[in-house]
């Protein structure tokens, strides 16, 4: 057998093993509203046998089969209807196929000549997403990034290098700039400030209202106070679909403040961004047109396989100016010069331009963004997977309306769950159904009281929450819990595009039965 035929046979054989092994291990076809997500009972010794050392001679097909069998039986089945704990779901069928397709092609996404067709797909898909998010700039577009945290990080780096262009050459002076984030924002936003050299003292946390959204009035006060303290606003970060309760910040109000004070306006829409596909839900992101950058993860609510994430921007020239470095051995796109000075050098200069950076002449030194094809020059990466292809094929397969229906199903199931929880005497719903996106947060109403037990209410709630969490997971469900500000830890159930009303009715019934059996 020649090498080509041998390789094809080898790939086919291994893929058949993957298919049969995962089908046996996961319980996605039994028709039950929940499926067992539990791991193997005693896997540790077998893990050690498998991962302790590599063999001198390869184990071939049999070793591969044994390994994936063990791994799959000790992995979480997120295709199970009972998987309601994390902000991700079963990967879509076209997504799985496209993931395999990308692995077979194995094209790098750093320069066009390494993957010409897939580069064109990334540019096209990013532009279509930017339009869907109502980014209206003539140079709007985006690039893929290796996750939502990476998107938030790159947005902050771009903000630093564009709002304060001298920082790309000299760094930032401690205490000169401030960033503003909600106290309900994802931790990666604050972490990004540390990575780019701002430090914790530069992070100003804005209080959230009772519904979990950023208080725009408090933001204005915080910006005013920072100015009095001698700090310039570098970036204001809003959230569309917060991690805990799915809150959507008022983008129109926050964006207006950001534009007025000259701050970069970033929106973390990693979880909630899928609403832009739905005419019924896209109002939740009213004001997105004001954003300078938006982080969006199709691998969350849309069900595109991990990792598929984008950083969308209103002006692609900002990505080029912020991230471009001289690497002529790799990037062959023409970099125009003005008066003999490269655009990179020009972007490193200081001047009065930074006060009106959205209309800065520095942006005009960037090349025509439609002609930028070496996409790594727009990012902080070099080697890049063509993850946009997964979104492209997923979108092509389902269409905008099909994606919208799945997003709407997740929200409908969550609101139905919220109503069930609200109406049951043993539960206390934290956020009302009309405030719910795709997560539902609630307490168990305990028979115990602080007077009876000597515990605080927060201690009682946290103890009950953990007991229910452990018990329901032992019954095959995957849920989660989170800390409350005053009343202790609460249960959190995250619905996804596959969650049905039948499933949430079932888990409510089993939680009630469990809580009463435990005497909580």
UniProtKB/Swiss-Prot annotation:
Start and end residues of each stretch annotated as Disordered: 338-357
Pfam families: Pyridoxal_deC
PANTHER family: CYSTEINE SULFINIC ACID DECARBOXYLASE, GLUTAMATE DECARBOXYLASE-RELATED
Biased composition annotated in UniProt, kind: Polar residues: 340-351
GO molecular function per UniProt: carboxy-lyase activity; pyridoxal phosphate binding
Protein name, UniProt field: Glutamate decarboxylase-like protein FG08083
Residues recorded with modification N6-(pyridoxal phosphate)lysine: 300
Keywords for the protein's UniProt record, in alphabetical order: Decarboxylase, Lyase, Pyridoxal phosphate
CC terms in the record's Gene Ontology section: cytoplasm
TM segment ranges: none
Enzyme class: lyase
């Amino acid at each position: 057998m020649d090498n080509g035929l041998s390789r094809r046979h080898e790939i086919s054989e291994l893929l058949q093993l993957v298919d049969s092994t995962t089908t046996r291990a996961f319980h996605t076809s039994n028709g039950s509203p929940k499926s067992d997500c539990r791991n193997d009972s005693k896997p540790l010794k077998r893990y050690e046998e498998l991962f302790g050392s590599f063999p001198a001679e390869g184990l071939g097909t049999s070793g591969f089969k044994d390994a994936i069998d063990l791994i799959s039986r000790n992995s979480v089945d997120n295709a199970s209807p009972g998987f309601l704990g994390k902000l991700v779901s079963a990967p879509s069928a076209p997504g799985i196929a496209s993931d395999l397709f990308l692995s077979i092609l194995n094209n790098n996404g750093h320069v066009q000549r390494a993957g010409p067709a897939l580069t064109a797909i990334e540019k096209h898909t990013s532009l279509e997403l930017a339009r869907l998010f109502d980014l209206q700039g003539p140079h709007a577009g985006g690039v893929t990034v290796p996750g939502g945290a990476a998107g938030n990080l790159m947005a902050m780096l771009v903000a630093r290098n564009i709002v304060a262009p001298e920082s790309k050459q000299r760094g930032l002076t401690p205490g000169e700039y401030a960033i503003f984030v909600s106290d309900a924002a994802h931790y990666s936003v604050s972490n990004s400030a540390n990575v780019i050299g701002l430090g914790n003292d530069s992070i100003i946390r804005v209080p959230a209202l009772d519904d979990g959204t950023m208080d725009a009035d408090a933001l204005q006060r915080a910006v005013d106070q920072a100015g009095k303290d001698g700090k310039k606003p570098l970036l204001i970060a809003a959230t569309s679909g917060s991690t805990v309760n799915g809150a959507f910040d008022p983008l129109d109000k926050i964006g207006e403040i950001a534009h007025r004070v000259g701050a970069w306006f970033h929106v973390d829409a990693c979880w909630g961004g899928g609403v832009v596909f739905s005419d019924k839900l896209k109002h939740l992101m009213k004001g997105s047109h004001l954003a300078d950058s938006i982080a969006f993860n199709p691998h969350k609510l849309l069900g595109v396989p991990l990792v598929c994430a984008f950083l969308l921007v209103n002006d692609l020239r900002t990505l080029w100016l912020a991230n471009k470095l001289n690497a002529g051995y790799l990037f062959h796109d023409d970099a125009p010069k003005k008066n003999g000075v490269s655009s990179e050098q020009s972007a490193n200069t200081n001047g009065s331009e930074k006060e009106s950076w959205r209309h800065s002449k520095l942006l005009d030194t960037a090349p025509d963004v439609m002609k930028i094809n070496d996409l790594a020059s727009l990012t902080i990466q070099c080697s890049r997977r063509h993850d946009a292809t997964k979104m492209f094929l997923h979108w092509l397969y389902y269409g905008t309306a099909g994606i919208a229906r799945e997003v709407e199903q997740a929200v409908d199931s969550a609101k139905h769950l919220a109503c069930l929880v609200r109406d049951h005497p043993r539960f206390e719903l934290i956020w009302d159904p009309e405030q719910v996106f795709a997560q539902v947060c609630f307490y168990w109403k305990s028979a115990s009281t602080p007077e009876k037990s000597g515990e605080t209410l927060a201690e009682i709630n946290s103890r009950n929450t953990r007991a229910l969490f452990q018990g329901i997971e032992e019954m095959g469900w995957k849920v989660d819990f989170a800390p409350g500000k005053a009343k202790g830890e609460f249960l959190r159930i995250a619905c996804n595009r596959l969650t049905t009303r039948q499933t949430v009715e079932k888990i409510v019934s089993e939680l009630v039965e469990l809580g009463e059996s435990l005497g909580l």
